[in-house]
Curated annotation (Swiss-Prot):
GO terms for biological process: arginine biosynthetic process via ornithine; L-arginine biosynthetic process. It comes from Mycolicibacterium smegmatis (strain ATCC 700084 / mc(2)155) (Mycobacterium smegmatis). Catalyzes the ATP-dependent phosphorylation of N-acetyl-L-glutamate. Keywords: Amino-acid biosynthesis, Arginine biosynthesis, ATP-binding, Cytoplasm, Kinase, Nucleotide-binding, Transferase. It is found in: Cytoplasm. Belongs to the acetylglutamate kinase family. ArgB subfamily. The lineage of its organism: Bacteria, Bacillati, Actinomycetota, Actinomycetes, Mycobacteriales. This is Acetylglutamate kinase. The keyword Transmembrane helix does not apply. Substrate binds at residues 68-69, 90, 189. Pathway: Amino-acid biosynthesis; L-arginine biosynthesis; N(2)-acetyl-L-ornithine from L-glutamate: step 2/4.
Length: 293
């Protein structure tokens, strides 16, 4: 008879310890970039969807921006289309863009919307094309010191946040696919990390949370003792040139968000069930927190 009592007491302590964070975040917007392994494991997908519903029912306003790299790569392979990456970004030809557009909104976004809506009529899927949410501008990247064209890859030039604010006010959870036109109507694929940062800034979010496939930010990867729990934007800017190429878009996104007025950005391990709740509602958190200098 003692074990259930201990279990109940432990659960009560966990819930009670979350109270300060629930109060701090009540009524605030939290932008979550959903990607990596959390998008490919069925248990993690279900846990993430439940986390978003939990936030919503606690009076917090989650906005999900999702990637789809593994799914796009799988579809390109299935169709016999060559794929390439430069500087951490997918090289996007018109043919690749058609596949990305189909997979992001038609497959990945739909699946997440359905997982969330298994808990109630909450999620609404949108793309950067809807209500002119994003206006893109062509992006080049620097690879080994050389400016490199990566095709129809865009950065976010402008965010028209009104449509998402309307959804939030209606109690919905926006699920955003990052395809968007430029000023001339040419559609681009926007890196989901980049889009999440721009959206967090435009929405006046309290936090930007980035799911990854590592425990957080390592200052000297692969030395696992170099994991940092908190870092400011000044130190992070100095560290940026030394990072692995796959981490660069995520760290650039954190810097953009925090420099744009978002109080904190968080790089967390999406391979852990309920990682978003652990990061937001515990003192210890998980991963790396980025704050202003």
């Amino acid at each position: 008879m003692s074990t259930p009592s201990i279990d109940r007491g432990f659960k009560a302590d966990v819930l009670a310890s979350a109270l300060p964070w629930l109060k701090q975040l009540h009524g605030k917007i939290v932008v979550v970039k959903y990607g990596g392994n959390a998008m490919t494991d069925d248990v993690l997908k279900a846990a993430f969807a439940a986390d978003m519903v939990f936030l919503r029912n606690c009076g917090i306003h989650p906005v999900v921006v999702h990637g789809g790299g593994p799914q796009i790569s799988a579809m390109l392979k299935r169709l016999g289309i060559e794929g390439d990456f430069k500087g951490g970004f997918r090289v996007t030809t018109p043919e690749v863009l058609d596949v990305a557009r189909m997979v992001l909104f038609g497959q990945v976004g739909r699946e997440l919307v359905n997982l969330i809506n298994a808990h109630g009529p909450y999620a609404v899927g949108v793309t950067g094309e809807d209500a002119q949410l994003f206006t893109a501008v062509r992006r080049n990247v620097t690879v080994d010191g050389v400016a490199t064209d990566i095709g129809l890859v865009g950065d976010v030039e402008h965010v028209n946040a009104g449509s998402l604010l309307d959804l939030i006010a209606a109690g919905r959870i926006p699920v955003v696919s990052t395809i968007a036109p430029d000023a001339d109507g040419v559609v681009h694929n926007i890196n989901a990390d980049t889009a999440a940062a721009a959206l967090a800034e435009a929405l006046g979010a309290e936090k930007l949370v980035m799911l990854t496939d590592v425990e957080g930010l390592y200052t000297d990867w692969p030395d696992r003792t170099s994991l940092v729990s908190e870092i400011d934007t000044g130190a992070l800017t100095q560290l940026l040139p030394k990072l692995e190429s796959g981490m660069v878009p995520k760290i650039e996104a954190c810097l953009r968000a925090v420099n744009g007025g978002v109080p904190s950005a968080h790089v967390i391990d999406g391979r852990v069930e309920h990682c978003v709740l652990v990061e937001l509602f515990t003192d210890e958190g998980t991963g790396t927190k980025v704050v202003a200098q």
